Design a protein with these regions (language model features):
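Alpha-helical segment proximal to the catalytic Tyr-Lys
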Residues: 108, 153-154, 228
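Short C-terminal tail/terminal secondary-structure segment
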Residues: 1, 128, 208, 219-220, ...
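Short, small/polar-rich loop/turn modules that mediate ligand/substrate recognition or access, typified
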Residues: 156, 161, 230-232
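Active-site helix of classical SDR
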Residues: 103, 140, 148
């Protein structure tokens, strides 16, 4: 299947690892000109919570961007009572404000150039909050889904199609790195990381966690010319963890 991405400028935030890195690789394989954004190990290195970051990312594009993938994010396995105001603000600034500023900067440029694609990487926790992750993550990921829908309604008529992908648990660095979610949950439960990972896998209808590449495949399709009639959608890529009728 030809996706029509050859030569198109595509920006991926959080592009240095996990889902973002897999998305950047897959877009490159389709012939896109990819610009990754992250704090480290990226084409554009900056803090996306800086109010000026969106303009700097747009300025770094060699020409009008075709696709923006808002993937940058973070999570911790913390109980609600442990969260401070600063913790809530950190999640809000990264998941909501950074995404909004980038969309606000990119959508007009895309519209002037004839159209484009924006994909926000939310989470199944934004559709059904998870007690495994901190409440600020679930709440801000839900806000990101709402933000996607608002921008989709505003920009579809000008050829800028905005959608979201809501992954379930993904077996990537966020989960498996030392000190990552598996270790954090193990400490909370008094178990070990392998027990946590196996429990997370077994609770999913498909019997396993997703790979970054499986999430990236959905993102890349939504970035493509083939997704020309998809706008305002929120695609669950979660192994069946969120009921279809949610």
């Amino acid at each position: 299947m030809q996706l029509g991405l050859e030569g198109k400028v595509c920006v991926v935030t959080g592009g240095s690892r996990g889902i973002g890195a897999a998305t950047a690789r897959m877009l490159s394989q389709e012939g896109a000109r990819v610009l990754t954004v992250a704090r480290r190990r990226a084409d554009v290195e900056l803090d996306l919570t800086d109010p000026d970051a969106a303009a700097r990312v747009l300025d770094a594009c060699p020409e009008a961007p075709w696709a923006l993938v808002n993937n940058a994010g973070t999570s911790q396995a913390r109980a609600l009572e442990e969260l401070t105001d600063a913790d809530w603000q950190e999640q809000w600034d990264l998941h909501v404000m950074a995404s909004m500023r980038l969309m606000r900067a990119f959508a007009p440029r895309m519209g002037e150039a004839g159209g484009g694609r924006i994909v926000n990487v939310s989470s199944s926790s934004g559709k059904r909050p998870s007690s495994n992750l901190d409440a600020s993550y679930s709440v801000t990921k839900a806000a990101q889904l709402s933000l996607s829908r608002v921008f989709a309604d505003l920009w579809a008529a000008r050829g800028v199609l905005v959608n979201a992908v809501a992954p379930g648990p993904v077996e990537d660095e966020l989960w498996t790195d030392p000190g990552g979610l598996a270790d954090q949950l193990a400490a909370r439960r008094g178990s070990d990381r392998e027990e946590v990972l196996e429990s997370s896998r077994s609770r999913l209808p498909v019997g396993r966690m997703a790979t970054p590449e499986e999430i990236a495949a959905a993102i890349v399709f939504l970035c493509s010319e083939r997704a020309s009639n998809v706008s305002g959608a929120s695609w669950s890529v979660d192994g069946g963890s969120v009921p279809v009728n949610f």
